[in-house]
Structures are given as C-alpha cells and as structure tokens.
Amino acid sequence: MEACSSKTSLLLHSPLRTIPKLRLCASISSEDVAHGRCSLTDQHLQIEGKNYSKTTFDHIFRTDATQDDMYTAFLSDTINSVFAGNDATVLAMGAKTNGKDERLYGNSVSRNGLVQMAITQLMNALDDNKDSEERIQVRMSAIMVSQNESSIVDLLSPFNPDPRHRVVKIVDDARTGVFIDNESEIRVETIDQALFYLNTAVDHRMIQDEHTHRTSHVFISLSLYSYKMGDKMQGGRRRLCFLDMGIGERNSTNGGMTMPALGSILLAMVQRNKHIPSRDSSVCQLIRCALSTSRFTTFVFSFGAKSDDNENIAHLACKIARTRAKSMVGHGRKSSGTMSTGTMESNSSSCGTTTITPGGTPRTQRRFELESGSELSAAETVIFLGPNSSRTASPASTTMPFTPTSIRPLHRTTRNHSGVEALSKPLSVETKSSPTHNCHDGCIHSIPPMLRGHTPFLSASLKLYDELCSPPSSSRASPAPPAAFGGKTSEKREDFGIMIAQPSIPLMKAKSKYNLDDGKMKQIMQWMETSEAPPILFSSPCYENSATSVEELRECVGILSHPLEDIIEQEEESMRTSTATTGGSKKDHPLRILSKQDLNVEPEIKDKQEENELELVMAASLSSMRSHDILAKLEAMRNAQNGNSVQNIGNSQSNTDMDVSEMDVYRRASHLEEYAMQRVREIEENKLKNKKKIKLGLNCCQQQSMISSGSTVVDWSQIERKKEKEREVHEEEMRKEMLRERRAKLKITELEIKRERNLIDKELDDKKGIANSIARQLQHFSLSPCRGGRTHRSVSTHRIDPPNASLPSTPTMSHKKVIGGSLAKLSASGASGSTGAPPSPALGYHQSLPRHSKLPTSVNGRRASAERERKSNKASRNSCSKERKISGSKEELQWRSPYAQMTSPKSYGGPGTSSSGRGSSAPGSDFETPVVSTTEKSANGTIPRSKRQSYSASSGYESANDYHIYSTTNKKPHILDKKRNEEKLSLVRQADEIRHRQWQLKKELEEAKRAIGQEDDAKMIANSSDQRLNGLSRTTMIDAMLQENRILEKRLVACRNHSMLVTTFI
C-alpha cells in the first residue's frame, strides 16, 4: 500500500500546513430575551449586562430564526466540506435549556434539529450522486463521556453484533493520534435507520437532569467510507461529527472540570498548541478526537439561567475569535467579520475550492478524483491505492442541494407526540439474503415483543425502551409486501416497525469481480479458509446452482469481518445482482428441515451431488433449533417475572402464516453463538437426568407463530430450580465433609499437643530442685537474733521491719505499759547494784544505735558513769555519719526516704506529751525511747525534760534503709537462678522442635510405606511412642532424638526411591 509517492504532496496535505476553517455562532432563545440575559443591538450583543462586539460571531440567530436559516448559514457548507474530502465538526456548547435541545434535535415536523437535517441531506446527497465505480458506506456511532463517573458509554452497544462486548476507550497514540477504540460503528443505509439510532442517543441526553447534563458530553459521528473500483482501488474515510458539550461543574471542590477548564482545552485545540491542559482526562481526549482531524469546525454557543456561566461562554467566544484572527493574519489572510450565507471561503492549503452554480447549488471541485479527510488532516486511516502508486488527476465534482428538502422528524419518545405526523412515504420491507457478513448485518432494527419492557441501558422507571428500540413505522399498509423465504408480510403489525428499510432510489450494480493482484487474493482466500465462522441462515443461489465456481462458493460461505471490509467489501447490491442473474429460482424456507414437506422427500431424489447442500441446510436447522431454545427460555423467564401461571401443556400446531420479517427477528436474535452453544451443552447434560419433559407451545410473541409440528421445548424455569436445589445440596455436603475433615485434624493435633505438654510438665516437675530453690530464697529473709549481753540475749533483738514500719505511728497505751514495766524493772535492778548513782542520761531520750549494737542496760554498773555515756554518744554519732556516707554512695541502688531530714519528736517525760514529729513506737523496735518513771523527779519537784536532738536518715529510718540495701545486695543469686532457668527453657524448646520434626518424619514414612504396600510397617510406625526416652537427662534425650531423626530420614528416602523404581518399571 502506498498513500502518496511525492514528497511535495505530503507537504501540501500536512496537517501543520492546513489551516482549519472556524466559525462562531450564537443562538438566542426566547427565554434569554424574556429574562433579560441577552439582547441584540445594531452594534453590540449584550450578555448579562456586558456589551460584546457583533463581529465576534459569524452568525447570531435571533428568536425568530428558523432551522432553515441555520442550515443555510453553516450546515450546508459543513456537508460540502465532508464531500470535498475533509472532516467536519459541529460543537454545541451551553447549559440545559429547551432552546439548545430544539436547535440540535428538534421537537416537531416544522422545527427539525440540526443533526437530523445533516443526516437527511447527507443521505440524500449520497443517493443523488451515486457512482457505479465508487462505493460509499455510511457508519454511525454515538458515545457519551461522564465527568462524574469518569466513564465512557457506548450508546449503540445494544445493536452491535459482536458478542465480545469489548470496553470502549479513547487511545492516544503518538503515531496515529487520538481515536476511539472498540466503539460500535453501525452501518446505516437509509434515513430511517440513521434516525432510529439517533433517537436512541438523543433519549439518553433528554432524560438527564441539569447536573448530569452539565458534566456529560455526547459525541455523534457519521463516517463515510468510500472505495473507488477500477484499474486500481482507492479508499478513504471522512467524518461528520456533532459534539454536544456541557459546561462542566459549577465549582472544583469535588475535583471536576469547570467551565474555565473546558474553555482552556478548547482554546488550546484551536491554537494548535503542543501542550493541552488535562491531557489524560477522558473529556480532553474526546475533544481532541473531535477537533484534531477537523478541517471545518463550527461552534454554536447557547446561554442558560446562570449569569456566571453565560459570562464564561462569552469570554471563551471572544478568545477563540481573537485566536482565529491572529492565525488568519499570520498566514497572510485578511479576517472577515461575517461570512456570506451559503458560501465557503477558499483556502490556499485546503484540498479544493467551492463555487456556486447558477441554480444556487454549491459545487466543490476537488484536486483529485477521491480525497479523504484523513489524508488531509491526520494519519489514523490507511488509504489503499492499489499496486500502482501513480495518481490520476481527472476532475470530479459533488453537487449538494442548496436548500433543505423535506426532512422526516425524529420519533421522539420523551416529548409530546401530538405534533408528529406520519412519514411522507412508506418504506418497503425487504429481508437481505446476502451471505456477506459485516458489522451491520447482525444488527436488529427492532425488538421482539417478548423483549419489550426490558431496558438494557435505561432505568425501569422511565419505560422508554418500548418505543426507543423500534424505528419509526408507518400506519399505512405496504404497497407490495415481498415474499421472501416462502412467507408473507402481515399488514396489521403494531408491535414493531420496519426491519431493514430499502432506499427509495435503487442501488447501482457493481462488478462481480475485483481487479486485485494475485498476492492480495491469496491472502484473502487464506483468511477465509482459516477463519472460524458460525453458521448463518441465508438462502443463496450459491448452493442451489451446482455449476457455481469454488471461488463463489467460498464467498458465500465465508464471513468477512470488519478488518477485511476495510480492504474490500461486498455490498448487498452485488449479491442482489448475482441473485437476479441466476434466474427465477424459488427461495426455500430457512426452517424447511423442520417442516413436513422436507421430511417427506423421497430418498431416490438425494444423490451424491446434494451432500454439500444438505450439510448447509443442517447447519441452518441447528441454528434455528438454538433460536427456539433461547426464545423459549426468555418466554419462561418473562412469565416467571410477571407472575403469570404456566400455560397448559400441549403441542402447538405449526402456523404457515408467519411474517417473514418476524421470523428474521427470531433468527437474528440468536446470532450470539457463544450463548447458543452454552444452552445446547446444558440441554445435553440434563437429557440424562430429566426423563419427563414438559412440552410447551412456542408462543414467543403471543401472536401468530410458526413452529414445526411436534416440536418440544423444555420448561427452563423448572430445570433451573431443580439444578439450583441439586447444586445447593451438593455444596452443603461438600461443606460438611470439609468440616468433618477439619474436626478430625484438630483432634489429632490436640492429642499431640496434650502428649507434648505432659512430657514437658514431667520434665519440669522436679520437686527436689524446686524445694531447694525456695529454701535458698527463704534463707535471705530469715530472722536471726542479735547478740546482746551475756545473760540477757532475749531482752534486745534486732530484726528487719518491713517498709511500712518506718512510717510514723501513734504509740498505744499497751505499748507504753509494757515498755514502762520493763524499764522500771531495769531501773530497780540498776539501783540495787549501784546506790546513789544518778540516773543515766541515756534513759531520758531516744538514741540511735548502729546495726547489731547492744542495748544499754543497767546489768553492768560500768555503763552508768557519764564518761561512758559520752563515749557511747560519740560512737553513735560516728556510726550515723558512716551510714549517711554509705547511703549516699548507694543512691543509684536504693530510693531515698522522703523523711530523711525530719527530726525526732520532743519528749517531755510523760506519755502522750510527744510533739508532732516522728517517733518510733513500734513494739520490739530497736529505737524505742526509754520512758522515765513518775517517781523520778528533779530537785525542784518537776519532771526533767528530755533534750531535743536532730537525727539523720539513719536515726529513725534505719529499718527502711536496711530493707532497700538488703534487696540490692541479694540480686546476684537471683540473676544466676534466672540464667539457669533460661538454659532449661532453651533445652525444652529445642527438644520440642526435634520432637515435632520426628512426628513429621513418621507421618511421611507412614505414607511412603502405605504407597509401596507395607501396611504392617506403617501401623508400627504410627503406634510407636517416645516413652523409652523418659528418665534421661535433657542433653542425652536431645542427642537420642536427633539420631532417631537421621534414621527416619534415611528410611524415608529409601521408601521413596523404591516407589520411583516400581513406577518406572510399570
């Protein structure tokens, strides 16, 4: 394939050197004028109180402007540019208003929409300019992009025969540009078909609320694929697009695109900038797909109820106008304020020129015979020029009507039908018998009655599917109902309309053969032989006439897909021509294998030459039976949903008055071969289980039907319920079995854990060791008596009080009595030993004694002297200072007492006369203050007062300090015990791991023994226990278990090797 051989031609048609034509239009509705949003003067256009120059817009359509005025202003030139080989786009932008919807889609016969007028004029022009050497095919697509959901919806997907249902996406390819992939491009042949698909897309747009309308955009395109046949074959594509855009979110709080963001994208596309804002968003990609290849773009702005939205639209229009003026001046052209009506300016770099004929019809002269918009704008379409790369320059022209002709209105489903009239002329119904399969043949142009009410893409509450999925039909009777497949057309049809509408002008005949080179023909034939094509129903003379060639038979049986159509396409007109040349052969019924007439054929008629024909007929009958099964299931599902009772069991008689178009609907309804094969497999599986079959009449549309006599169908609802019950029972049994297995495994694991736990407890249950450890710990807390005098060792004992003994406590009377009595005895004995001696001053106040010191007693008379007393006081002071040093050096190991700086209480000699200071009154304490008896008085007759003396932390709180010091000095034995316990626990853990590994090896060895047939050894291994290792030390037991694990591993390897050898010999 070669597109262009000359470098000059490539530069001439380069997109960078081609200036796209741009027009700006504004539409003012009656609502805008009534609410004061817009007003028009002689010089300015006032929008929301601000004046804008009228020269900003090429055309301003007032409230009294008609649709014909808009067609004359820009739509006729747009269609002319498409026929001249360019891509054209009409972009309508504005809020949701009645004025915008009426301008685009119309609402009555007198007020047709722009999209409908473009479709009508385009199809009429194709019929009027039909060329025998050129074939033009029109395909229609419609998608919707939602900003809120970030999704792309294919509005024509219900009519796409492709069973794969691939996801539609917009691809940004650096080599080919932006294009829409996997969209449903439906082939249209007549105006009514195009309007039917347009009706589907428009209904999606009409039912949207204001917010959804703002954030969604609808893209409708009509693609013209042209192929020129002759000594060489040329082809290309041009496209007419309509982009109905919203105005975006009101604010960007939720992350959506607003009107300024959309305006920046449009402005960047008009300015041909390399950097485009929001390049990765689906909305930006859709705008690029619509405007990147367009050579003739028209903006139609409309205004809404929000003042800020109207101001944003006006600012965007001004910016686009300034950009257009700069681009024209930069390329040496003078910008004109307003374009003349019905004309199109010539462009120095465009593909051709447009002139006005004397009759008022614009005629476009093209540089070459056939040019494509893709050739001039982008490189996304392959152009096949045949084996010869040279291009002829024979002039050709395309004539377009200047004024719009009679246009059929849209069959609106969301509007009032009072203004809709019948079609101007009826359409004849003809069923196509062409075996050539393309994207349009599998499309169902109307829906059977059983499917009505089941909306595949709208909500059930809207109830629009009944009229949405049926093209507009005429109430008049068809003048000449055709007789195809042996059937008749019913004249009293109200359930749905036409099937395939035939154009009013007969199609031109095409050549039966194509001038292709041998290499291309071989590739096509190889593809047709290797492709897997599902059987189809058709009646063709290819197998009626046995004298046909092998090539023609392959053309009839083979199914061409869309990629092969881009190279070469066989249209229905070529098959119609070949059918007419074969003579008046009578067409057989597609279900003739199920009728009695074909079952009673005499065997002598069948011969060897008709075997191929029989195989084709059997394939058709199999497809028909699949259709019956599918429709029967759909009918059963419909009856179950509506709550209707099952019809009476019986056999239905065949009806020969079946309408041909209705039978074609049933045949086409089963084109999804994957689903049909699945249903056939289910029938074969249930055939052995279900002995009793319920025979129901095939009443698919509750009208006249045609079924072979004796045909049986299955009650799919009952079968599905039974299968569902069996499936539930089976699943329940499987679940119970899994639970049982899990319970058994848990029991085994529990027994193993118990056994291991008993072994561990037995190893750790060493009573003698525990008793020794407890005895060693108690030795540190044992109470040892202090060494006192020689004769009175039990009088004074030194013991360690708990920490709470150091807290202040009030002395009780019982304590005082005991202390007073004991001291009285001591004083009496002392008086008898040394008469006339003064009382010891040590008995008059509290004295702090060092640890393990002796209490002062009166047994020895040597301690009664004052000199001894002073020495004892000096020694006590030295011991207190030493204890303070020791306590200071051990600050990090013990807590400092909060009462360290407190003084001892004042004692006035009598009970209950102590001060509020701290005094040690615990019974048996080493620091009790001797109480002076009441008999001892001073010289003046008063009780002598004790001296007040301050004590440090070692005086009254020696017991608390001793407790903390004891706790810190006895930490070393505890750390050693902890290390020993950790060693024991590590040995226990190691033993557990080895024991678990041994258990795993035993299990694997048991399975290996069973695999080679040694059941006895397997039982012995399973019943073996570890009781023989009891009583051993831990290290010995660990060594023994390691040795046993090595032996088990060797035995396991030997068993596995033995099993492999046996398997190899077998």
Swiss-Prot record:
One cellular component term from this protein's GO annotations in UniProt: microtubule
GO biological process: axon guidance; cell migration; egg-laying behavior; locomotion; mesodermal cell migration; microtubule-based movement; negative regulation of motor neuron migration; neuron migration
Biased composition (Polar residues): 387-406, 931-957
Xref: InterPro entries: Kinesin-like_fam (IPR027640), Kinesin_motor_dom (IPR001752), Kinesin_motor_dom_sf (IPR036961), P-loop_NTPase (IPR027417)
PANTHER family xref list: KINESIN-LIKE PROTEIN CG14535
Coiled coil: 717-765, 987-1021
SMART domains: KISc
Tissue localization of expression: Isoform a is expressed in the AVKR neuron. Isoform b is expressed in the CAN cells and in the body wall muscle. Also expressed in the motor neurons of the ventral nerve cord and additional neurons in the pharynx and head.
Bias type Basic and acidic residues, positions: 880-894
Molecular functions (GO terms): ATP binding; microtubule binding; microtubule motor activity
Span list, region Interaction with unc-73: 402-874
Entry keyword set: ATP-binding, Coiled coil, Cytoplasm, Cytoskeleton, Developmental protein, Differentiation, Microtubule, Motor protein, Neurogenesis, Nucleotide-binding, Phosphoprotein
UniProt keyword Transmembrane, yes or no: no
Species of the source: Caenorhabditis elegans
Protein's name according to its UniProt entry: Kinesin-like protein vab-8
SUPFAM superfamilies hit by this protein: P-loop containing nucleoside triphosphate hydrolases
Residues covered by region (Interaction with unc-51): 332-514, 514-715
Gene encoding the protein: vab-8
Compositionally biased tracts (Low complexity): 335-363, 827-837, 904-925
Secretion signal span: none
Renumbered residue ranges of the record's region Disordered: 328-367, 387-411, 471-491, 569-592, 784-815, 827-957
Boundaries of every Kinesin motor domain copy: 15-326
